[in-house]
Each structure stands twice: as C-alpha cells, then as structure tokens.
C-alpha cells in the first residue's frame, strides 16, 4: 500500500464510492446531490492537500487536510477521511489518520480537530479515541441521519507532537 497526493484521475476512480458515501447520509454533511465538479473542488482543490491510499491500482481511501480556521487559529488542522466499503476493517482509516498527523506536523500544525464526527459512526469515534483524540464537545441533534433522524455530532481534538 502506498499513500500519494491525489490526482484528478484518482478522484474520478474514487467518485462512485464518494458519491455512495455522501448519498448514504450517515457520516458526511455534504449535499447528497453534489456533482463531480463540486465534489472535486470541495475535497481535492479547496483543502491544502489531498491524498489517496492505493494497493496496486485500486484506491482504498482518501483524505484531505486544511486549516481548521483562518488567521490566529490556522495552526489547528482539519481533516476528512473516506474509505471504500470493500476496504473497511483493514486498518486503512488508521493508516490515513497517522499519515495525516505526520503531514500536519510537516506543514506546521500543532493540533488536529474534527468538527463534526457523527455520534452514530461508532467505528470512527472508537478509532479516533484509540489514536488519542478527545471529544471536546457535543453538538446536539447536529446531523440529520438518513435512517435515524437527528443525532448528535462530536467535536474531536488532538494536540500533535
């Protein structure tokens, strides 16, 4: 497996998975009707950097990194991760998160914050906690889950060393 900066052709290959994930409305607060061009801009162009993890020619997952906020708070990074369904349970999200922390340090960030981890996404919450992220806040009924209705979201944070 190797992690590299994303190309447009990588995103084109991952697009069906990306679209399925946002249309499921279980983990990401993206418009489920987002088109390719808007999704590419949102995930790959607007962030500071974007990466994919590949095995052979298969894309297993992706993440972006960007400042969580501008100006005096720009030392805190924010990331988003997606893993293809057929790659789940293989440690891909963990590898991506560890890679993103290293990249964050290289880019001069001192912390990482996830602004809206859907509380019902137990696998992600548990993984982030194993990787020393703390829940620093709960946003009540912040996410309109397709099957469960309004559920809480967590703000999760980690100081980087």
Task: Name each model-derived stretch.
Residues 81-82, 139, 145-161:
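Terminal substrate-recognition subdomain of acyl/acetyltransferases
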Residues 129-139:
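Conserved acetyl-CoA-binding loop of GNAT-fold acetyltransferases
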